[in-house]
Each structure stands twice: as structure tokens, then as C-alpha cells.
UniProtKB/Swiss-Prot annotation:
This is Uncharacterized protein 005R. It comes from Frog virus 3 (isolate Goorha). InterPro entries: US22-like. It comes from the Viruses. It holds the Pfam family US22. Residues 1-20 are annotated as: Disordered.
Amino acid sequence: MQNPLPEVMSPEHDKRTTTPMSKEANKFIRELDKKPGDLAVVSDFVKRNTGKRLPIGKRSNLYVRICDLSGTIYMGETFILESWEELYLPEPTKMEVLGTLESCCGIPPFPEWIVMVGEDQCVYAYGDEEILLFAYSVKQLVEEGIQETGISYKYPDDISDVDEEVLQQDEEIQKIRKKTREFVDKDAQEFQDFLNSLDASLLS
């Protein structure tokens, strides 16, 4: 199945296959090399290339569909991004959404994985209430694909009493927690309503 999205970079992005769009992606990587951790570079790249695809790894059938948070299932839920930045990693880390993980075979990964670039240069992905470390840089992701880092972060259930006391005193953190709980509870209720309606239709 041919993917309708235009490519930003060919999987074999060498001199023989250089195109204006592959130049754009190579420029993006060079800018990140010059300004490590500058999320404005990521934001500008996303704005210029929204809706296009960025292949990852030379032999992978996966790519990043470039978009910001509004192009994901979390459209309008900016507090979700704030929770990823503040509550998952060992230290608060600012992030910029690069896009969503997609497959060239036409079957999107489930759950939807949101790909982000951190101020620490690393590439992360959020899905199924977990953040995975995909690569240590955008360049590594594009050239070598998703890395088997074995590193993942879940919402911390085992926060120490001291850390929890500090978090309880942080009003912004509490707002993020409250909105996140409301979002999760809303999804759970909608899913339960769907199951109830399904049961009712089967019994009728």
C-alpha cells in the first residue's frame, strides 16, 4: 500500500537520492547539531513540514508523521504534554512534539505513540501510559532507527514521602495531576459506556 504522505527524507538519504525535502531534513539535523537541545529548532521544523513523513532507519517500515500536539489524539490537551515533561522522567525535561509513529504498511501502531524531542537531545515516545527512550538524538533515530535502549518511564507510583511533599506544595504540578486524572477518568467512562451499549445491542 503506497503511503500518500510526501517524504521529508528518503530512507537511503545519501548524495545520490538528495531531494529538496531530504535537504530540509538534513538541514534540521545540522541545526540540532549546532544548537543541541534548542526546541525552537524542532518547533520550526514541525511547522514547516506538518503532514509530511520522516522515515526512521534505513531498513525500517516505520516513519514519523510530522505534527504538533494538535495533530495527535491529545489535541487541545496541553496539560498532557506538561505531565510528560514534569512527572515521568527522573528530572523535569522540556519536550517538543515531533509527530506520531506510523507504519508504511498502512496499519498504525496501537496505541498511538507520540514522538517527542527533549531538551536533552533525546527522542522519546509516549504511549500506553509510558514514555520510552527511542534514541539519543534525532540523527540517530533517522539513520539507525528506534534503539533498543531498554529505558522506559512510567508515572511514578513509588514517590518518596519527601518528594511527594514537595510535589504537593507545587500548585502547577497539582493542576497537571488533576487534569490528567480527569482526562483518564473521562476516557474510562466513555469506554465503559461503549461496552454497556454493546451489551445492550447484543441482548436486544
